[in-house]
């Protein structure tokens, strides 16, 4: 089916407070977002990590010999290098002050995704969620529960009675996004590191293009493209970690789906390692 004429909207969710460890992030977002059936919520990784207690003191890491060696070569803080190694399954590149690793999740990125920006306390670092797909599933459940328990919460254009409320519960998707660099291009782009309730890949293999030619390899990274679209309406200093993306309801599913793990290329198909 042609996508001609379809509209995509990205709506920032404003007003989120500073999130602390143990917070019910899904409930907090549900109280502020106006959601419709088929909406997709893109949530920044950092706020998820904060809620999950993944912001830790840099001083908690005790550098080993390899961390000290790499730190001397790269000009990085030894404790930070140790944390990067702890969060990685393999070091792929270590040069020019850059440490590229494969994380335990299977992500290939700089510094194992560890970040020091936009943190309320000095001397702390933010780790990626331990299991971003599980985090996305949990957030989706929290948001749905919050809407179910409080009539009117999180529903765009509705003030339902408690009796009719259950019939209005929206089916939504959640994407957890993070900024990744690209090996052959300058700049960073948001990608999906976790998702739930979404078809993350739109497989066009075997279909025909506009000229009737059979497509052999085309797979659209829906979750990544939604993450990137959401990032265009928030800035890194905006304190807006959540964005509603509307218009992708054809990819939103009733079940949690395969998650963003489906986007990772199998090692045996990787031409560059």
Task: State what each model feature region is.
Residues 3-5, 145-171:
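Intrinsically disordered, low-complexity terminal tails and inter-domain linkers enriched
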Residues 5, 9-16, 55-62, 66-123, ...:
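A structural signal for small-residue-enriched, beta-sheet-centric alpha/beta enzyme cores
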Residues 3-66:
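N-terminal, positively charged regions that mediate nucleic acid binding
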């Amino acid at each position: 089916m042609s996508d001609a004429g379809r509209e995509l909207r990205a709506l920032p969710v404003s007003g989120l407070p500073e999130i602390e460890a143990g917070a019910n992030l899904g409930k907090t977002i549900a109280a502020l977002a106006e959601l419709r059936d088929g909406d997709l919520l893109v949530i920044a990784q950092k706020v998820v990590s904060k809620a999950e207690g993944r912001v830790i003191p840099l001083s908690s890491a005790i550098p080993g010999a390899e961390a000290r060696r790499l730190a001397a070569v790269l000009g990085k803080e030894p404790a930070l290098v140790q944390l990067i190694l702890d969060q990685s399954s393999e070091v792929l590149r270590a040069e020019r002050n850059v440490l590229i690793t494969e994380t335990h999740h299977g992500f290939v990125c700089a510094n194992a995704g560890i970040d020091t920006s936009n943190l309320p306390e000095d001397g702390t670092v933010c780790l990626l969620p331990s299991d971003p797909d599980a985090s996305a599933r949990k957030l989706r459940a929290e948001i749905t529960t919050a809407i179910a328990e409080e009539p009117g919460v999180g529903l765009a254009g509705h003030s339902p009675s408690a009796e009719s409320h259950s019939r209005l519960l929206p089916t939504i998707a959640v994407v957890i996004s993070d900024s990744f660099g690209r090996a052959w291009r300058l700049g960073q782009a948001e990608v999906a590191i976790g998702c739930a309730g979404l078809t993350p890949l739109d497989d066009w293999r075997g279909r025909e293009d506009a000229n009737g030619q059979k497509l052999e390899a085309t797979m659209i990274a829906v979750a990544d493209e939604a993450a990137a679209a959401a990032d265009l309406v928030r800035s890194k200093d905006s304190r807006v970690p959540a964005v509603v993306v509307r218009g992708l309801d054809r990819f939103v599913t009733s079940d949690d789906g395969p998650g963003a793990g489906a986007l990772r290329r199998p090692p045996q198909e990787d031409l560059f390692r």
